[in-house]
Regions:
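C-terminal helix-rich "cap/oligomerization" subdomain common to oxidoreductases
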Residues: 1, 27, 104, 164, ...
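Predominantly a Rossmann-like dinucleotide-binding segment in NAD(P)-dependent oxidoreductases
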Residues: 4-5, 12-87
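Conserved loop-to-helix N-cap of the C-terminal "lid" that shapes the substrate pocket in Rossmann-like
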Residues: 64-67, 169, 191-197
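NAD(P)-dinucleotide binding in Rossmann-like oxidoreductases
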Residues: 89-94, 103-175, 190
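Short beta-strand scaffold segments in enzyme catalytic cores
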Residues: 99-101
Length: 207
């Protein structure tokens, strides 16, 4: 409408360990996806200006601060959920939510929280494919194959070994680089599609 190039930043779409899940799902390398888990847990943010983060009208609290990232990735990687079951406990000592999203042939359980105690922030996932379990915990990605092999994808991996290459990169820098290249080339940044974001916001508003 205004003839400008814009992109809403959703950094997990550029995060190597998360991109890996989409690649494995699309390629079928380890068979069909059977189930998944994504979590994003931490404590109440005390660092924001003017207590901005604790003002629901401005920040949206846990659904929009934390859960939005995992939900956006799910919609990006697997499409719009067929159904969902959501629970939220918004109390003085916690803002905690959990949701199960159903997709054709599998479901993903998610959780996100702000706790009143000084619980350290952490993001994690587990995705169970037919032939392997892929995890991301404490900043490390591991693949547990059904044949007993366990390994961490690394930037040193090469195609001729059959292992998976994870580029060592800064997801935020890759996101900015992608948008910059779209602006310079005159291409619309369709890696972050408006219809996917509308789906995400619609689901978040149900909490």
């Amino acid at each position: 409408e205004n003839n400008v190039c814009f992109m809403i930043a959703q950094v997990l779409r550029f995060w190597p360990e998360y991109e890996l899940i989409k690649e494995l799902y699309d390629s079928g390398k380890y068979g069909k996806l059977l189930s998944g888990y994504m979590g994003r847990l931490g404590s109440y943010p005390a660092w924001s200006w003017d207590n901005w983060m604790m003002d629901e009208k401005r920040s949206g609290l846990v659904p929009y601060d934390l859960h939005i990232h995992d939900l956006d990735f799910l919609v990006y990687a697997f499409g719009k959920p067929e159904a969902s079951l959501k629970h939220r406990a918004k109390q003085p000592n916690q803002d905690y939510l959990t949701a199960v999203y159903e997709f054709p042939g599998f479901f993903v359980t998610t959780e996100a929280s702000w706790y009143a105690s000084a619980y350290p922030f952490g993001a994690s996932y587990r995705f169970q494919f037919e032939d392997a379990l892929v995890t991301y915990e404490k900043g490390e990605c591991k693949i547990y194959e059904n044949n007993g092999s366990i390994y961490s994808p690394t930037e040193q991996a090469t195609g001729d070994t059959g292992s998976i290459n994870l580029p060592k990169s800064d997801a935020y820098a890759e996101e900015i680089k992608y948008f910059k290249n779209c602006v310079l080339s005159g291409q619309f940044p369709d890696r972050v599609k408006a219809e996917e974001l509308r789906t995400v916001v619609g689901l978040l508003n149900e909490f």
